[in-house]
């Protein structure tokens, strides 16, 4: 267990160096440190998040897709953090439909992911309002949560009986306030919590 902890900490150290190098647009140093992080801990999702950002910055979109996609095998929970970037890497190659389908596939495989907003926004661009709305509704119904219900109410309010509209609007604003309060990041390793 201690060996694992050290590997995790070493990988995080290299990720910090890579993130700093990326911020300074020193992409060679960033890439080197990402590789060191992955050498220390091959399950380091953060390293692939940074690698995807490096590849995107260099215009190497197929490699960005590969880096972001590798997160599924490392820790699928982090896919929520790269959903939009993954789609944009597909889009830069003219493969918007493929990118959208991959995000939908992730939601169907891992219903706990928070990708509903990205999927809805991208489907809206590609398929139009009614198809995007139906897609969002179907995905929310698979595993309802506050974020999904908030989105669902937003989609349904315009079709509602006027007598219900005010109540539905009030429910949506209560859910929205609760969502703002509950957006927390929790580290699975050290249990650190932070408002995102």
Regions found by a protein language model. Give the residues of each.
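Start-of-helix register in tetratricopeptide repeats
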Residues: 5-12, 46, 80-81, 114-115, ...
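Residue-level recognition of tetratricopeptide repeat
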Residues: 19, 53, 88, 121-122, ...
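Structural motif corresponding to the intra-repeat A-B loop/turn of tetratricopeptide repeats
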Residues: 24, 58, 93, 126-127, ...
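TPR-repeat structural position
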Residues: 27, 61, 96, 129-130, ...
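Conserved structural position within tetratricopeptide repeats
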Residues: 36-39, 70-73, 107-108, 140-141
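Short coil turns that delineate tetratricopeptide repeat
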Residues: 42, 76-77, 110-111, 143-144
């Amino acid at each position: 267990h201690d060996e694992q902890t050290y590997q995790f900490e070493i990988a995080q150290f290299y990720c910090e160096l890579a993130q700093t190098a990326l911020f300074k647009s020193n992409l060679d140093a960033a890439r080197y440190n990402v590789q060191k992080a992955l050498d220390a801990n091959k399950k380091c999702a953060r390293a692939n998040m940074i690698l995807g950002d490096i590849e995107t910055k260099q215009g190497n979109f197929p490699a960005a897709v590969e880096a972001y996609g590798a997160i599924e095998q490392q820790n699928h929970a982090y896919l929520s953090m790269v959903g939009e970037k993954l789609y944009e890497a597909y889009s830069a190659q003219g493969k918007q439909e493929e990118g959208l389908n991959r995000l939908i596939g992730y939601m169907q495989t891992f219903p706990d992911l928070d990708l509903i907003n990205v999927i809805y926004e991208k489907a809206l661009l590609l398929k139009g309002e009614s198809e995007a709305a139906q897609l969002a509704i179907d995905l929310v119904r698979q595993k309802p949560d506050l974020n999904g219900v908030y989105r669902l109410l937003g989609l349904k309010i315009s079709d509602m009986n006027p007598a219900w509209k005010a109540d539905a609007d009030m429910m949506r604003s209560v859910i929205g306030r609760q969502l703002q309060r509950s957006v927390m990041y929790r580290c699975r390793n050290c249990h650190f919590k932070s408002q995102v």
